[in-house]
Amino acid sequence: DETLLKEVIAAGIVSPRKMGDMEMYSPLDREVLEIIRKFNEYGIDVRNLKMLKRQAEAEVSMYETKVQPIFLRKNPTSKAQAEELLDNLIELGEQLRSTLVEVAARSFRGNRQS
C-alpha cells in the first residue's frame, strides 16, 4: 500500500536508493516493509514501530564498540573475525530480546509460563 510505504519512509525506517527516477529497495528493506505491513494488519502503526528501529540502532551501536576495533586492525583475518563477532552478538541480542519479550508478556498469559 502506497500510503503505508510513504509513512515508513517518512519515519526513516527504510530509505530507498534513487536510481534515476526510480526508487530501489534492498531485500532487507522489502522484508522490513512486509513485516510492518503485517503489524499494520493488527492495528500497530508505523509511529509505534519506529521505536523498534531506534532500539535496533542502539543495539548495533553497542556492538560497534566491540567490533569496530577489530575491523580497524591491519591483520588480514581481522575482517572475518569482526564479521563473526558481529554475527554472534546479533544472535545473542535476538535471543535475549525474544526471551525478555516473553518474560514481559507473562502478565498477559496469566503467568502460565515461566
Segments predicted by a language model, with ranges:
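Arg/Lys-rich, alpha-helical DNA-contact motif
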Residues: 2-114
